[in-house]
C-alpha cells in the first residue's frame, strides 16, 4: 500500500519539472481512436485525449456530437471530492471533523459521528454496500426513498468507522450534503461558482433527488471536452489556464490511495477520496494512472508521466464490457504515445 502511494505521488508531482513528453501527431491519434468506429456494442459516445494541456485527439461515436451532455454516473463522485476540497480550501470544512458538525440533523444517527475523511474513502462503517441488493444502505433503496436525506439517517452501523471499505453511493451522497450545509447553498450552485465557471464549463446538468439535494453520488451530465478539462485541471495540480481552482495539497490527499482494493476491483488497485489508482504495464514500463470512474465505462484517466488526460463517455450502463472497453482504449492510447 505504501509503495503504491509513493509511486503514484512521486509521478504526479514530479512531472512538472521533467522534460515534456512529445505528443503523438494528431493523425496518429486519430488512427488509434478510429479502431472503435465499428464495434459489437454501439454505445461508446466519445473519447477526448489531452496532452501537455491541449487536445491531441477527439472522436465521437454512434451519432454522438461535441455538444452532447452525457451522464457520467459515478464519475460525478470524483467531482464531489473536488468540491469538498474547494470548500476545505475556503475554510468552510475540515475532513477530520464528524459529519454532524456540518449536518446537524445527523446527530444521533450512525453517520453523525463519522469523520468526513472516512466518508470520502468509503469507510464510514455503515451497512451500505452497492454490491449487495439486500444491504440496508444500497443505492437502489436510497434512490427509491421518498426522502433520501431522511433515509440515510436510518441506516445502521455495520463496522467501526475507518476499518472496512465498502463501495456505496450513500456516503458520497452524504459528502454532498456536508458540502451543501458547510457552504450554505446547494452543491450544484457552489459547483457553478467555484468549479465549472472558472473552468469555462457553461453547459452541464446535475440531478437533484427527491429531497432537493444535489446528488453527490453522481448523475452529473457534461460534454466530453469539459469532462477532459476537469481531468486536465487535476493533472496540473489544481490549476487551469493559470487559475488556481483547488489546492495541490488537497489533490495530493484525494489522489493518494488510502485503501487497497485490488482484491475486489479488477480495474483498480487503490482508492483515495472518490478517485481510483492503478499502475498499468505499457510495453514493459509501469505507468501510474488515477481516474474517475462511472457505470458504463465513463472515465477520466489522468496520466502524469505522459502529461496526459483521456476522457471517455459511454452509455454501456450496467454492462461489464463498458469498463473493459474503456481500459482497452486507455492502453491503446498509452501504447501509441511516448
Model-derived regions: residue spans:
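Structured C-terminal helix/loop/strand segments within mature extracytoplasmic catalytic/sensor domains
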Residues: 292-338
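Active-site SXXK
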Residues: 53, 70-96, 119, 175-179, ...
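Bacterial N-terminal signal peptides
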Residues: 5-16
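Active-site helix/loop module of the DD-peptidase/beta-lactamase fold
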Residues: 71, 90-127, 154, 183-218, ...
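Active-site-proximal alpha-helical segments within enzyme catalytic domains
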Residues: 171-178, 218-239, 298-314
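Catalytic-site signature segments of enzymes, centered on catalytic residues
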Residues: 66-67, 133-218
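Active-site Gly/Thr loop motif
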Residues: 202-204, 256-309
Amino acid at each position: 500500500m505504501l509503495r503504491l502511494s509513493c509511486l503514484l505521488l512521486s509521478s504526479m508531482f514530479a512531472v512538472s519539472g521533467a522534460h515534456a513528453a512529445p505528443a503523438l501527431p494528431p493523425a496518429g491519434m486519430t488512427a488509434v481512436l478510429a479502431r472503435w468506429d465499428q464495434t459489437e456494442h454501439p454505445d461508446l459516445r466519445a473519447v477526448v485525449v489531452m496532452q501537455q494541456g491541449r487536445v491531441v485527439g477527439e472522436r465521437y461515436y454512434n451519432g454522438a456530437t461535441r455538444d452532447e451532455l452525457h451522464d457520467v454516473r459515478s464519475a460525478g463522485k470524483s467531482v464531489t471530492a473536488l468540491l469538498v476540497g474547494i470548500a476545505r480550501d475556503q475554510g468552510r470544512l475540515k475532513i477530520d471533523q464528524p459529519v454532524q458538525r456540518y449536518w446537524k440533523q445527523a446527530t444521533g444517527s450512525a453517520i453523525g459521528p463519522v469523520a468526513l475523511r472516512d466518508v470520502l474513502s468509503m469507510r464510514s462503517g455503515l451497512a451500505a454496500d452497492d454490491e449487495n441488493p439486500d444491504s440496508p444502505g444500497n443505492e437502489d433503496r436510497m434512490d427509491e426513498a421518498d426522502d433520501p436525506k431522511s433515509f440515510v439517517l436510518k441506516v445502521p452501523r455495520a463496522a467501526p468507522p475507518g476499518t472496512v471499505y465498502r463501495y456505496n453511493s450513500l456516503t458520497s451522497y452524504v459528502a454532498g450534503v456536508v458540502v451543501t450545509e458547510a457552504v450554505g447553498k446547494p452543491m450544484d450552485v457552489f459547483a457553478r461558482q467555484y468549479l465549472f465557471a472558472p473552468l469555462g464549463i457553461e453547459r452541464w446538468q446535475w440531478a437533484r433527488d427527491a429531497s432537493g439535494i444535489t446528488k453527490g453520488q453522481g448523475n452529473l451530465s457534461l460534454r466530453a471536452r469539459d469532462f477532459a478539462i476537469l481531468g486536465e485541471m487535476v493533472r496540473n495540480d489544481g490549476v487551469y489556464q493559470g487559475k488556481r481552482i483547488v489546492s495541490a495539497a488537497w489533490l495530493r490527499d484525494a489522489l493518494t490511495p488510502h485503501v487497497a482494493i485490488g482484491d475486489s476491483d479488477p480495474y483498480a488497485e487503490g482508492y483515495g477520496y472518490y478517485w481510483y489508482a492503478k499502475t498499468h504495464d505499457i510495453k514493459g514500463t509501469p505507468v501510474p494512472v488515477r481516474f474517475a470512474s462511472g457505470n458504463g465505462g465513463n472515465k477520466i484517466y489522468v496520466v502524469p508521466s505522459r502529461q496526459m488526460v483521456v476522457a471517455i463517455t459511454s452509455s454501456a450502463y450496467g454492462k461489464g464490457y463498458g469498463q473493459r472497453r474503456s481500459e482497452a482504449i486507455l492502453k491503446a492510447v498509452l501504447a501509441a504515445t511516448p
